[in-house]
């Protein structure tokens, strides 16, 4: 089954995404500014009300470009730690240099926080498994937090070089429109990214995805996941529409 990730910019959008059938969301705030780091209360609320929902959390301290100061980098580190503590299943991050390359030192810093969390979770799980041998208690699998490099990728000056850097950093996927105005317009680049990735990292097409074009984008690129806000504007803000979510899922999965 092809997976749809729904970008949710507020708690009511989480409800709509789940109602429409979504199994994974990207949670952010202020979707009107292309998404900012959400309050930790939103993360906890989503996980408490929908325990089986996979919640990926955007880390973006401000609107504008993706070139961050030292103070902003410090804030992002804190936001990653807070999101992990709040129960995030995935962290969505990205940063660039003024020249339009991946900010490898900052990304290494943020990725190391997630990797340290995952290592600690593995150690805890190992201890539980040892205990299970004595108590006949068999715990479920430990939670591994995944990492997505977000659409800062679409501003990279050398996308194929950036692809290799992001793979080396250990990210699980790249959210991208193929450096075009929409994912549908960027299918040629998306297809080439998918080819070059060779299964080493997922390519997640996003931007302008609708029930009418989602299946075409997937067929043209060979990607196995897709990202959409599935949103409408109500009361001056973007909110997820359950019918649009259901429509995309129907289009990509029949």
Please tell me what each predicted stretch does.
Residues 56, 60-63, 197-254:
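C-terminal alpha-helical cap/extension of soluble enzyme domains
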Residues 11-12, 31-53, 71, 97-117, ...:
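Active-site-adjacent beta->alpha loops and helix N-cap segments on the catalytic face
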Residues 12-16, 67-79, 157-169, 193, ...:
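Catalytic cores of alpha/beta
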Residues 84-120, 138-162, 166:
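Hydrophobic, well-structured mid-protein blocks that either form specific transmembrane helices
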Residues 46-107:
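Glycine/small-residue-rich loop that forms an oxyanion/phosphate-binding "nest" at active or ligand-binding sites
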Residues 2-6, 25-27, 55-59, 91-93, ...:
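Hydrophobic faces of well-ordered beta-strands that scaffold small-molecule active sites
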Residues 26-36, 82, 86-98, 171-184, ...:
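Glycine-rich phosphate-binding active-site loops on the catalytic face of alpha/beta enzymes
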Residues 19-28, 50-53, 87-90, 144, ...:
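Glycine-enriched alpha-helix->loop->beta-strand junction motifs that scaffold or abut catalytic
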């Amino acid at each position: 089954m092809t997976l749809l990730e729904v970008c949710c910019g507020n708690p009511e959008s989480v409800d709509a995404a789940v109602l429409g059938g979504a199994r994974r969301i990207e949670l952010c705030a202020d979707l009107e500014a292309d998404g900012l780091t959400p309050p930790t209360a939103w993360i906890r609320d989503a996980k408490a009300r929908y325990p089986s929902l996979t919640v990926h959390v955007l880390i973006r301290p401000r609107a504008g470009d993706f070139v961050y100061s030292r103070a902003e980098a410090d804030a992002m580190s804190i936001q990653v730690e807070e999101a992990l503590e709040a129960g995030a299943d995935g962290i969505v991050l990205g940063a660039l240099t003024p020249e339009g390359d991946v900010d490898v030192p900052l990304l290494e810093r943020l990725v190391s926080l997630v990797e340290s969390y995952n290592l600690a979770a593995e150690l805890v799980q190992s201890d539980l498994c040892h205990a299970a041998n004595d108590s006949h208690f068999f715990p479920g699998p430990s939670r591994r937090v995944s990492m997505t490099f977000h659409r800062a990728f679409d501003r990279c000056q050398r996308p194929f070089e950036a692809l290799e850097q992001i793979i080396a950093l250990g990210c699980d996927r790249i959210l991208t429109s193929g450096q075009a105005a929409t994912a549908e317009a960027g299918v040629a680049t998306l297809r080439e990214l998918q080819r070059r990735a060779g299964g080493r990292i997922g390519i997640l097409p996003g931007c302008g995805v609708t029930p009418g074009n989602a299946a075409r984008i997937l067929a043209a690129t060979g990607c196995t996941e897709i990202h959409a806000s599935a949103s409408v504007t109500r009361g001056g803000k973007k909110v997820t529409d359950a019918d649009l979510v259901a429509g995309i899922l129907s289009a990509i999965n029949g």
